[in-house]
Curated annotation (Swiss-Prot):
FAD binds at residues 4-34. GO terms for cellular component: cytosol. Its EC number is 1.5.3.-. The modification S-8alpha-FAD cysteine is found at C307. It comes from Salmonella dublin (strain CT_02021853). This is N-methyl-L-tryptophan oxidase. InterPro entries: FAD-dep_OxRdtase, FAD/NAD-bd_sf, Me_Trp_Oxase_MTOX, MTOX. It catalyses: N(alpha)-methyl-L-tryptophan + O2 + H2O = L-tryptophan + formaldehyde + H2O2. GO terms for molecular function: flavin adenine dinucleotide binding; N-methyl-L-amino-acid oxidase activity; sarcosine oxidase activity. Its cofactor is FAD. Monomer. Belongs to the MSOX/MTOX family. MTOX subfamily. Keywords: FAD, Flavoprotein, Oxidoreductase.
């Protein structure tokens, strides 16, 4: 059987692509080396932030707004909501370049963002402490996503729509010819007109020339009471320390508040190098500088987890066809800020498989930027 689209890697982007391409009427085969959702990629840990006024650059905002529409639609397929509109407050020094980008994105796209000085910030959320020179940019319409629930939902919807799924089967080789793409797996060979490579952290095992660096990252859950929950209107947050370190976190659930550090981590080259949480001496204490200064009422570390970022050299996404192979799209280099975009990236992949030109300007995400 020849498929219209084979998806190599069915985590966040791959799961979304499988659903949207199948829904569009294509014959799709989704593959994954494991059984998604799983612990081997970048999507586990229950929750991910979603922010609209994007500190990483205005080029992301159109993608973000489309992604939000798709998240809202996906949430209707579950009794438990996938998107929780908790609001997100971005904390940092008044001269922060990241916050300046947030403000610029909000102004350009007329997004609902409220600026609070340090006093107003601590008055609204007495649990938060910041220096006098800090500000907060509060996005009331943003919040967080239930990442594993989202992937489970996409997989179910794709399967119900007739999508073929081959999991726990690693792709060992990809062959290109005039008729399309053939993949080799432990279960045999499969052929399609087009392919999406969304293999996340270990994409270089299949495409060694891609400029992607795997980074081991950790996040942890700390003891917190009801003051830090959505029931008390406590928001999700990002926070920049005076030394430039960037943290992110979520409202407490079941008296546990999840927090992680966005920068830093350990460069790795193979899956076995991603040691479990607490295997690196600094893991348990990584969030202490932020908690001690900004959220002093939070208690001790309860448990944590390790994941992996697939970092590109400039930490911007890679969305492009493989050089010399126009029938193969690669989406990688999401650099620790990609999950919130998963539905729109999946839709872009479905449009690619349909032969449609994307309605988004994807020029900033081309591979050619690294050779200029």
């Amino acid at each position: 059987m020849k498929y219209d689209l084979i998806i190599i890697g069915s985590g966040s982007v791959g799961a979304a692509a499988g659903y949207y391409a199948t829904r569009a009427g294509l014959k799709v085969l989704m593959t994954d080396a494991h059984m998604p959702p799983h612990q081997q990629g970048s999507h586990h840990g229950d929750t991910r932030l979603i922010r609209h006024a994007y500190g990483e650059g205005e080029k992301y905002v159109p993608l973000m707004l489309r992604a939000q529409t798709l998240w809202d639609e996906l949430s209707t397929h579950n009794e438990e909501p996938i998107f929780v509109r908790s609001g997100v407050v971005n904390l940092g020094p008044a001269d922060s370049a990241f916050l300046a980008n947030v403000a610029r994105s909000a102004q350009q796209w007329q997004l609902n963002v409220e600026r609070l000085d340090a006093t107003a910030l601590m008055t609204r959320w007495p649990e938060i402490r910041v220096p006098d020179n800090y500000i907060g940019l509060f996005e009331a319409d943003s919040g967080f996503l239930r990442s594993e629930l989202a992937i489970t939902t996409w997989l179910r919807l794709a399967r119900e729509a007739g999508c073929a799924q081959l999991f726990n089967s690693q792709v060992s080789h990809i062959h290109h010819d005039d008729n399309g793409v053939t993949i080799e797996t432990s279960e045999g060979s499969y052929h399609a007109s087009k392919a999406l490579i969304s293999a996340g952290t270990w994409v270089k095992a299949l495409v060694p020339e891609l400029p992607v660096q795997p980074v081991r990252k950790v996040f942890a859950w700390f003891k917190a009471d009801g003051r830090y929950s959505t029931k008390n209107r406590f928001p999700a947050f990002t926070g920049e320390m005076p030394n430039g370190d960037q943290y992110y976190g979520f409202p407490a659930e079941n008296d546990e508040l999840k927090i992680g550090k966005h920068n830093g981590g350990q460069l790795i080259q193979a899956p076995e190098e991603r040691k479990p949480f607490a295997a690196v001496a600094s893991d348990g204490a990584e969030a202490f500088p932020f908690l001690r200064n900004v959220l002093p009422g939070i208690g001790g570390c309860l448990h944590g987890a390790a994941c992996t970022y697939d970092n590109s050299p400039d930490e911007n996404f890679i969305i492009d066809t493989l050089p010399g192979h126009e029938n193969t799209l690669v989406i990688t280099g999401l650099s620790g800020h990609g999950f919130k975009f998963a539905p729109v990236l999946g839709e872009i992949a479905a449009d690619f498989a349909l032969g449609k030109t994307s309605s988004f300007d994807l020029t900033p995400f081309r591979l050619s930027r690294f050779s200029q």
